[in-house]
Each structure stands twice: as structure tokens, then as C-alpha cells.
Amino acid sequence: MVKLIASDLDGTLLQNGAHDVNPIVFDQIRTLKEHGIMFAAASGRQYLNLRRLFTPVQDDIAYIAENGSLCIYNEETISKGIIEQDLAYRILDEVAKYPQYNCIISGERVCYKIGRAHV
């Protein structure tokens, strides 16, 4: 018996450069829920970006965000991967040596861009 269906976004639910999920997908997610099957949006994207993409069903699905390092269901963090603070500072120090690069640091609900390169 199927209990969970997870799908990637870019190149799967969002094809050919699409920026919005096809509304038919939301109907399918609702049908899955009616049959007791959970849907999870899985992506390298940030959690809040995923919630925005799935606004019509955002409270009915699970999220596997940040390439799997952040999993949230019912606004509760199920699991998260954390980089040790010392390692994070070492990475930032290394990136700072290359002014043409930026570093994006993602948290559960916020991200920071560090660097001088034009994005």
C-alpha cells in the first residue's frame, strides 16, 4: 500500500522553465490525501519557497527542502542537517578569498547572501 509520494520540482513538476505548479497538481494532491496518501515536495529549494509554490495545499503536504537537509510537516521540523559553527566559519573564510563568488547561508526560515559578486 502506498502511503507517501514525493516529487522533485525543477524538471519534474516544473518543466520547461515553468515558475508555477500546474493547478491540476493541487487537485491530484487533494485526491491523494482523500485516499490517505501523503504528498511531499522534495527539492533543493528553501522551505518558504516551496510553501509559496504549493500555496493552495501548503498545509496539507510535507516538505523535503534544502536537498533533504530540512524536512517539515505540519509546521514542525521533522529533521534538519546542521553544519557545525566552526566549519561554517571556515567555509566563509575560504569563500571570502574569492571576491567573484558569493555564499548563501540557509536557515529554516531565512537565508543570507554574503559576498560582493553581482548576482
Residue ranges and their predicted role:
Residues 1-2, 65:
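Short, small/polar residue-rich loop motifs at catalytic or cofactor-binding pockets
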Residues 3-18, 91:
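Asp-based phosphoryl-transfer active-site loop
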Residues 26-116:
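Active-site phosphate-binding/coordination module
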